[in-house]
Amino acid sequence: MRRLTFILFFSSSFCLAQQALLNAGNIQIHQDGEIGFHVNLINNGTFNQNLGLAGFYNTTNSLSIAGSQIPRFYDMEVDVVNHLFLDVNTEIINSAAYTTGDVITPRSNPSISLDYLDNSFYVLETDISNTDGYASFNGNTEFRFPIGDDDKLRPLITTNSTPNSIIKAAYFNEDPNFPSVFTNPFDTNSLESIVSQISILEFWDFDGPDNSFVTLTWDSESEIDQLVPDLLSLRVVGWHISDQEWKDLGNSNVTGTFAEGTINSFVFNPLDYEILTFGALVTEDELEIFNLFSPNDDGANDTFIIKGIESFENNLKIYNRWGNIVFEVNNYQNDWDGTSNAGRVIRRNQKLPAGTYFYTLELKESGRASTGWLYINY
């Protein structure tokens, strides 16, 4: 018969005047066995060969799991009114039940998380009972992260694109311009040209392999109706680490209403993006045309820019002062450097002389057309 060694002592490190159970040996919960923790757990020994239920229960105080070794539970129940705090990774291999209270991880240390292994699952998550901080998943099925912040459950949904790799996520109910634990702000005025607006109410941190896609969720407090006129205009956006700006990550599917719904991103590489949130694309009325450019190959202002035009199927024509077409293209992508490609010009396929030119821009979906002038200067 295996002997279990427990040391019971008073500890003020976690919660004043509460007792803590220190495991310095080897604890194992056998199949159909149950153990209830009404005090803090400090795991400095072996506690990873479990087949039964580990429950954490307290109707008055908070509880914590700490120690030098990671505990691994088969089934875990949390029924702690003032929350269960993790100071060490805690692993689940079958199921977790969020009966009462949050499981709180230190947001300033994303390496500590509640870890769902081997396609494990959870139940009973709510606005007031979820993982407040980081959760991870190791499996090959779709996973709906039970993450939240400030009494607000806001799942992120994804399928692991690389089986047996670890994906991790956390939700932040805060303005990305003023993040609480990140080193740098995420300026919502620093935008890719086709993006017009970014949510300042919330964001997610998501870590996963290349070729990932995510589904973000919202409710009425997300104020999606203040971002876009309709849900088809809504986008998933991400803060690009290298370019230091918000980029469009797409809208492959959207469901629900302004009050509650989901949006799917396109496939992207999470390693390139620090955080994710909701955004809106430039509308036709928000297209911004820069009339002056200097295509002298100095790396600054070398092309004719129509900010946001990449979002629209279009036709662009450029005319000289005699009304001759000197450049024409379908689906302009802000890459014209003043080189002629059409009409009767002296130096076809060469750059046009400095001077004033005129354009017509047609947006094909709406049929809207606009005209104006531009000036080339070398």
Model region roles, listed by residue range:
Residues 19-62, 67-73, 77, 81, ...:
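Self-processing/autoproteolytic domain segments and adjacent N-terminal interaction modules in large
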Residues 1-25, 276-278:
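Bacterial Sec-dependent N-terminal signal peptides
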Residues 214, 236-237, 276, 323, ...:
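Residue-level detector of buried hydrophobic side-chain packing
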Residues 283-378:
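Short loop/turn motifs at secondary-structure boundaries
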Residues 215-217, 258-269, 335-341:
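Exposed aromatic-hydrophobic patches
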Residues 18-19, 228-233, 240-299:
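Proteolytic cleavage junctions
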Residues 67-70, 207-212, 264-275, 302:
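Extracellular interaction modules
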